[in-house]
Amino acid sequence: MILEVKDLKTYFFTDKGVNKAVDGVSFGLKKSQTLCIVGESGSGKSITSLSILRLIEKPGKIVGGSIQFLGQDLLQLKEKQMQKEIRGKKIGMIFQEPMTSLNPSYTVGFQINEVLKIHHPNLNKKERLERVVYELERVGIPHAGDKYHEYPFNLSGGQRQRVMIAMAMVCEPEILIADEPTTALDVTIQAQILELMKELQQKKGTSILFITHDLGVVAQIADEVVVMYKGHVVEQASAKELFADPRHPYTKALLNAIPKPGKEYRKKRLETVDENVDYLSFPKELR
């Protein structure tokens, strides 16, 4: 395992009480594998990904568990070590909305360049420029040399997301965490971004932790799937097993809620996840 999360607990302490956003989550990610964490909004999947990089802000706090990465527990590292050795260098992250993740005051080239400055200070200015342009070309940005000098608001949504992927991949990290990277994109651009991520993975052997609520996306890219509900893992299985034989009632409810093609389904009411059912009362299904 390149990454092993054990009994992770991330709580938010508010005036209204304690919100156990992530409560005892465990899973492992193998080298060159794509693992999808799936669940409805509020299930704790994004908080899990932010916890791995220790990006939890107050009133949130990681209160327990361990995150083993290449033999070291990330929760035991000092903040300086996380900044210099882990974030961006060994573990890259693509956030959900590139327009809020990219700084509108700086060109996209400058922002990718900054990542190289921090993690590869041995590169000179010319080498960094060449590396950034190469990375923009690799993610399919046309006229990459010109786009280097563009500001984020001058690019399309698809191009901004490609810039985010370039920024996350420029240091060739061991793991790429993608938090709902295609949610704000149309179906065509979404397919292109997913294909791009698969290509980059095949070329570099990168492990991908993909956060999504879209089971259609999961079917396209996942090797392994972790299903989360209210801060807990309720089922884990290979993608093939999960879609062929879902065992936990919550997983079944998620799959049943997917709109189905065909005339016989056109007039049928779409199924929903029953909020009155306590899905945590059922045993976990870990295969």
Q: What does each model-identified segment do?
A:
Residues 62-73:
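Conserved ABC transporter NBD signature motif
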Residues 73, 126-146, 255:
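Conserved ABC ATPase "signature" region
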Residues 142-145, 238-287:
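Short catalytic/signature loops enriched in Gly
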Residues 218-220:
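A short, surface-exposed alpha-helical micro-motif characterized by mixed small hydrophobic
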Residues 224, 236:
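Short, glycine/charged-rich "phosphate-handling" switch motifs in NTP-dependent
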